[in-house]
Amino acid sequence: MALNLQGKQAIVAEVKEVAKGALSAVVADSRGVTVDKMTELRKAGREAGVHMQVVRNTLLSRAVEGTPFECLKDTFVGPTLIAFSSEHPGAAARLFKAFAKDNAKFEVKAAAFEGELIPAAQIDRLATLPTYEEAIARLMGTMKEAAAGKLVRTLAALRDQKEAEAA
């Protein structure tokens, strides 16, 4: 169905608004993936705080102008599915990586984070970013480990000192 000018402007405005509030974006080619699989992907995306949309490349190019995702323009070739992560920068990358593992025809093209283009081969960099809770848990674990190690070293030094005095 052909879009009139107002429809195209509405799509560009919607995508531009989502892009302004997004932390990262991932672009993929979903040719050959069945509708029920795409529906599952969209459902998982909604649960993860990821906005997904298939948009014409010309409209998408206009929508990302002036955003940190302008670096993705060269990847807008063929059918383009774009996903914007608004809650966690690695959410869309993690979702697409897992989906591509189960669906051979689904191809991740590239991602963008803080204005930097991340090629598909390096998408793991973005997908493995810890969530806020995971980062806090790792930090707390490191801090507890350091405190326990210091206690052990202090007790060992105290033991050595008492042994030296007794000898």
Swiss-Prot record:
Pfam families, per database record: Ribosomal_L10
Highest rank taxon of the organism: Bacteria
PROSITE patterns found in the cross-reference section: RIBOSOMAL_L10
One Gene Ontology term of the molecular function aspect: large ribosomal subunit rRNA binding
InterPro entries membership: Ribosomal_uL10, Ribosomal_uL10-like_sf, Ribosomal_uL10_bac, Ribosomal_uL10_bac_type, Ribosomal_uL10_CS_bac
Coiled coil segments of this chain: none
GO cellular component annotations of the record: large ribosomal subunit
GO biological process: translation
Keywords: Ribonucleoprotein, Ribosomal protein, RNA-binding, rRNA-binding
Subunit architecture: Part of the ribosomal stalk of the 50S ribosomal subunit. The N-terminus interacts with L11 and the large rRNA to form the base of the stalk. The C-terminus forms an elongated spine to which L12 dimers bind in a sequential fashion forming a multimeric L10(L12)X complex.
Protein family (similarity comment): Belongs to the universal ribosomal protein uL10 family.
The protein's role, per its UniProt record: Forms part of the ribosomal stalk, playing a central role in the interaction of the ribosome with GTP-bound translation factors.
Protein's name in the database: Large ribosomal subunit protein uL10
Species of origin: Yersinia enterocolitica serotype O:8 / biotype 1B (strain NCTC 13174 / 8081)
